[in-house]
């Protein structure tokens, strides 16, 4: 076990950063969900892409609110987060929301790939014609990994931590493999408890790498499809920026942004687990916590910029706010 004392000033700064990130996450994902739901009510129908985007936004919205509740509990009642049921509940909420956040984003990439790419392969055409069923099947199969993930975490929790109710301390066994990182208060000091588990790391990495691999394959297949389409356009002596090419490029931009953010996220998960063994510094761990929230927030804003309807709605809101501010400025004596 590694125990690092962190100054109250550092914790205050960390909490402020978390609050800013969570606020941005609530605004961004709330905006995506609100725009799509309002459009759904008006049109009495919703596209498959909007279904995925709305579900993804609601999932990340729940995650942001759960993190906000956890921070408020940490500030207002630090003794509450020492209760085993609170820790277990927060852990399960984080795992479930993180799982659906990543897998729904993966489904979005697969959906774009099947709808936009052009291949004459019979298997691809079979999947392309049944893209909705493919996305649904991906979600169903991912539930198996979710159950295994939660089951593995519960096993490690039972063997790694014994929380003494009413006493703000942990009793950890000699062979502890505690896979999570928690903050808790004790008098005027705050400690960060963590343990690098060489057994947990490959298991957790496996669960995270599966959707990443699926997204990566879809991304490279989309690049290959664009290359084939570009060659075909050259043979036919047509302009390179037809509708299909534009659709390919937009999908690739969205996919590349997701993969880069996802790769950075995975990188800091590994660094956060291994940092004590090689560096023993608290800054890497704090940055790891921040990156865990930055990934879904950043990707949500990427989705807003990459979706024409969401982008138009954003510009409309910004124009309204600017006109509103000018009106208030004129009315102000």
From Swiss-Prot:
Q: Which Gene3D superfamilies match?
A: Rhodopsin 7-helix transmembrane proteins
Name the residues that span the membrane. Answer: 15-35, 61-81, 91-111, 135-155, 206-226, 254-274, 284-304
Q: Which GO terms describe its biological process?
A: detection of chemical stimulus involved in sensory perception of bitter taste
Enumerate the Cytoplasmic topological stretches.
Answer: 36-60, 112-134, 227-253, 305-333
Alphabetized InterPro entries for the sequence: TAS2R (IPR007960)
For molecular function, the Gene Ontology terms on record are: bitter taste receptor activity; G protein-coupled receptor activity; taste receptor activity
Where is this protein chiefly located?
membrane
Q: What is this protein called?
A: Taste receptor type 2 member 110
């Amino acid at each position: 076990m590694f125990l690092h004392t962190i100054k109250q000033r550092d914790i205050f700064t960390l909490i402020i950063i978390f609050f800013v990130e969570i606020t941005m996450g609530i605004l961004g994902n709330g905006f995506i969900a609100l725009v799509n739901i309002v459009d759904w009510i008006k049109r009495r129908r919703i596209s498959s892409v909007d279904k995925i985007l709305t579900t993804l936004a609601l999932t990340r919205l729940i995650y942001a609110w759960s993190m906000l509740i956890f921070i408020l509990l940490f500030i207002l009642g630090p003794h509450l987060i020492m209760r085993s049921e609170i820790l277990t509940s927060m852990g399960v909420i984080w795992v479930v929301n993180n799982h659906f956040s990543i897998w729904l984003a993966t489904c979005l990439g697969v959906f774009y790939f099947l709808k936009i790419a052009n291949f004459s392969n019979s298997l691809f055409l079979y999947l392309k014609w049944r893209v909705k069923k493919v996305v649904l099947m991906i979600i169903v199969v991912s539930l198996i990994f979710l159950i295994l993930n939660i089951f593995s975490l519960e096993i490690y929790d039972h063997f790694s931590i014994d929380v003494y109710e009413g006493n703000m301390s942990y009793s950890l066994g000699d062979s502890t493999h505690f896979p999570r990182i928690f903050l808790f208060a004790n008098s005027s000091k705050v400690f960060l408890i963590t343990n690098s588990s060489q057994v947990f790391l490959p298991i957790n990495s496996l669960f995270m790498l599966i959707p990443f691999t699926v997204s990566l394959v879809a991304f490279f297949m989309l690049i290959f499809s664009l290359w084939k389409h570009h060659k075909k356009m050259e043979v036919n002596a047509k302009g390179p920026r037809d509708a299909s090419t534009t659709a390919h490029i937009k999908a690739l931009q969205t996919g590349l942004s997701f993969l880069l953010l996802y790769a950075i996220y995975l990188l800091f998960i590994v660094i956060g687990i291994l940092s004590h063994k090689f560096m023993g510094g608290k800054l890497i761990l704090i940055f790891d916590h921040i990156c865990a929230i930055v990934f879904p927030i950043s990707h949500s804003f990427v989705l807003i910029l990459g979706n024409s309807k969401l982008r138009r709605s954003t510009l409309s809101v910004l124009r309204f706010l600017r006109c509103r501010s000018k009106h208030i400025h004129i009315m102000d004596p």
